[in-house]
């Protein structure tokens, strides 16, 4: 079922690009206004959710059926750890907050990106999106590479420069959610003049293919796991 709505987050990111790009104010003002709105709820829920998990599991823990939750691991000591380690990353209790961490990163780069977007030509944008589109295929290349005999570098299975001492490969700076911001800006600046029939004719097959690929990759074991 999750594969059906996997496109939701990219669509939310695209709406962010539609509404905010190009940034029309200074970096400091933009950061204060946008990131300032995210930090309070991030702080609140990073503290509230572990407390709620702890209270629930110590009240109804015996009835918990989730195979990923061990009520015995929710000790007072672990609760305290969860309450301060959110500064490094989200934890199991706060998994839905991953989106806010990602959104802060996008807000940080948007003023810089906006300066380029103002002077970029249509061809510039198309070239960026083409390279970004290629970068989106990297997870599938990583799945296929071991089938072709690729054994990694010193045990690290990263591609094109990724290794134990470097997490930033060739396509790192063209990868991730930043491309959805540029795609949204491009579609606003150069809108497609398609009929509804053509739009559905193109998008429905793409959605079906995306669903099948996502579903199959999540339910099938990775070639790495079979070696």
Where is each model-derived feature located?
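Membrane-interfacial loop-to-transmembrane alpha-helix junctions, especially the N-terminal start
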Residues: 30-34, 123-128, 196-203
């Amino acid at each position: 079922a999750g594969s059906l709505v996997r496109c939701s987050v990219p669509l939310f990111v695209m709406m962010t690009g539609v509404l905010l790009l190009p940034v029309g104010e200074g970096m400091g003002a933009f950061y204060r206004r946008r990131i300032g709105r995210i930090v309070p709820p991030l702080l609140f829920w990073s503290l509230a959710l572990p407390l709620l998990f702890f209270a629930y599991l110590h009240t109804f823990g015996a009835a918990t059926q989730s195979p990923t939750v061990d009520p015995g691991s929710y000790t007072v000591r672990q609760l305290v750890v969860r309450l301060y380690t959110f500064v490094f990353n989200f934890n199991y209790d706060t998994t839905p907050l991953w989106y806010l961490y990602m959104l802060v990163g996008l807000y940080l780069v948007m003023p810089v990106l906006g300066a380029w977007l103002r002077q970029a030509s249509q061809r510039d944008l198309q070239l960026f999106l083409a390279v970004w589109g290629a970068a989106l295929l990297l997870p599938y290349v990583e799945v296929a590479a071991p089938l072709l005999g690729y054994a990694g570098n010193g045990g690290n299975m990263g591609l094109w420069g990724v290794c134990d001492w470097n997490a930033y490969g060739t396509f790192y700076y063209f990868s991730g959610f930043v491309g959805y911001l540029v795609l949204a800006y491009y579609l606003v600046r150069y809108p497609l003049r398609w009929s509804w029939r053509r739009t559905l004719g193109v998008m429905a097959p793409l959605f079906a293919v995306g669903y099948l690929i996502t579903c199959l990759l999540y339910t099938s074991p990775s070639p790495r796991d079979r070696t």
